[in-house]
């Protein structure tokens, strides 16, 4: 990439962000757009603009975000969202403190050396001699065996020590945040329940429920309340979903009748396009009556004949449930497996009956499948990354050369084509990875999202960071490697590939924070979709609410996306220190934009009380470890005699991770008894707690109950039953 293309990419991205921010300032002030820009507040019964200022100042939202407290985030979006901001602020602190030393130290050292000038072939440059302006500010301009490399080694130590400090501080803070939430005096159903799996077959003459009740009543005679046995609900769920669909269509038909005074009709065939013409209200009322009868029949069959070897067990106190969840109940570990119960809306009922050894086999099979997929997915990503450089693109498609030679087109293509191709490829992954995570037999939605996030992180690191880094170089040198496949040549290739990809990643990070966060803040696409649906499709208030329901922060993709930027910034922070400015901007702007969205827009679909943090902590350490290994290799490629001094840092990272896990992780895996023993505001309604876990498809439904509950309730109900 040429220097002009880089500036065009950066400038264009910034201009787009400014335009989107101005659009947000203008559009968010209009009352008709409130459901798009303030849905969180609306769903909580608050006035959209309460506590805010309707001003033309485009930076007013920043002031509101900066003045908000962590408790505000917890109150409006939950502990998990607050923990995500701890992650953003921790990484921002790491990069800001690192830059205080690295930028004033490393940039002058690199700029005043002359390695690039003295190297005729310039094989070590960032972009093969076409980007010398930034090459001179990178480690590529440092002469081999130079004493200046001591400063770069010191920078590796500084970044590592800063990271250890901030991670330790953050882990303590998140642990405290989780404990405070769990000590809340409010009654939460999941704190009075445990999840029991791998139950043995009941003795003759006992049902599964009688067996589990007698088992736990014997162990906990004073605190056991009752149990809810898991059932095979696939058929009853389908009937329930059809019934809900008919209720929705009936409500829609009644709304049309009220608005037009004409009774709506529809055809009974495929998609309402063919078949007999009928009165919609009478037709859907009849279908509802039929479905209710089918549902009641299937409910009786499910409760009598389809009980499974899993259950939710309830206790009269929080401390009894917390104690039971961490106790070994059977001498054989594959029987009576007990864990803390997730929230009712999180349970993946279809996974509860999967046995322990089956879960282990599934887990390792899916790990193997994901590893193979990562390797094969690297092929198209590396290929596309290689051919989307204009030089390689002209070699493969010669007839585009006249078009590419037009300066304006060439600049735009160089600025955005490779980065957009990469983003498109990564967008295909999240649903597949979430499906695979659920297939492991994981019992809760939040756990499945954490598992999918981990898989996505490794996809990103291997396919984006490593794949893109090597793609262009391999594309040009594959013949040389085939002729002379020596280890030293491959190591040299790895070392020299890093600086050559620095400008690609600078542009990639800029594209992510300017355009990505600009679209996030402005919500242009959700706004357009909402108004189109409202005008042409929605007939009932419930349909309008469904059209603007915002969803949550999408941790399964957001966390690994942030982790990729973290990894890139880490690994290039010493090689090309300018990337620290981009990393600081990404996480700083991300903190501001997401703070606004958390307080006003997104609605959490679950609460795990910060259980994502150990996953985040581990991935940050993995990125730091990769950075240290990369610097060990690159300093070695610079033939620096004291490269081995990086090894103690690598060992320290492993020890630090182990110590943190031993000290903090137990409080995230289980609820500490000193936390669970705190008093409640009022005595818990145990029957209400029990009923919270009953799948909605097993609740009673009457024909006249065809009203919609609203977007929030419907979304939670669907999660509780389908587990999706």
Curated annotation (Swiss-Prot):
Residues 241-309 form a coiled coil. GO terms for cellular component: chloroplast envelope; nucleus; plant-type vacuole; plasma membrane; plasmodesma. It comes from the Eukaryota. The keyword Transport applies. It is found in: Membrane. The chain crosses the membrane at residues 5-25, 86-108, 148-170, 359-385, 412-439, 449-472, 498-529, 555-574, 576-594, 613-636, 642-662. Residues 26-85, 171-358, 440-448, 530-554, 595-612, 663-724 are cytoplasmic. Its main location: membrane. Acts as a hyperosmolarity-gated non-selective cation channel that permeates Ca(2+) ions. Mechanosensitive ion channel that converts mechanical stimuli into a flow of ions: activated in response to membrane stretch. Not activated in response to membrane poke. This is Hyperosmolality-gated Ca2+ permeable channel 3.1. It comes from Arabidopsis thaliana (Mouse-ear cress).
